[in-house]
Amino acid sequence: MKLLGRSHLVAVAAVTIMALGVGAALANTQHHNPPRDGGKHGLHGQCSPAQVARNKANVVAYYTTAFNDKKPEEAVAKYGGPVYIQHNPQAADGFDAFIGFVKAFTTQFPQLHVDIKRVIGECNMVVTHSHITTSPSDRGQAVADIFRLNRQGKVVEHWDVIQDVPATSANDNTMF
């Protein structure tokens, strides 16, 4: 029987610790970051496939109307809920702040385009994976937006993760 070397043991220990940490993190996700509105604008329990489909369609329409059509007021009027909790540290809470941001961003970059590549929904949570470009020559950014919707299918909370599309990659895969 061949014994594992020190580097192999360290690697096995690291993988084991990471697996235990990920498992513990996943076990605690339901209670880790409760909605700041006390959950009164969210859904609880199970959702029907029709609710999930409605929520996904509403998020796509909300984002497309706001950014591609450059009509953030219309997007908020149709798809915004009574509150808008923002988790991007560079953006303020509230739909007025969202409207102001979209107007400033689309004025600065009139050729801005959001290409939603995929939409994932689970109950009142919807995730979009998008390629955002500011001009046809821009490599752009890969963006994952996470939205929470209320019982009426209106957007009430937002998180995002943004990564620049690099000029070169260590692999032949795209970010999309």
Language-model segments: what does each one mean?
Residues 2-12:
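Bacterial N-terminal signal peptides that target proteins for export
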Residues 59, 75-76, 84, 98, ...:
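Hydrophobic pocket/interface hotspot
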Residues 59, 121-132:
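A short hydrophobic beta-strand element
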Residues 144-174:
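Short beta-strand edge/turn micro-motifs at domain boundaries
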Residues 26-65, 69-78, 172-176:
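Short, low-complexity N-terminal intrinsically disordered segments enriched in polar/charged residues
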Residues 12-21:
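Bacterial N-terminal signal peptides
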Residues 72-122:
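A solvent-exposed, acidic/Ser-Thr-rich amphipathic alpha-helical stretch
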Residues 112-114, 139-145:
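Short, surface-exposed coil-to-beta transition loops
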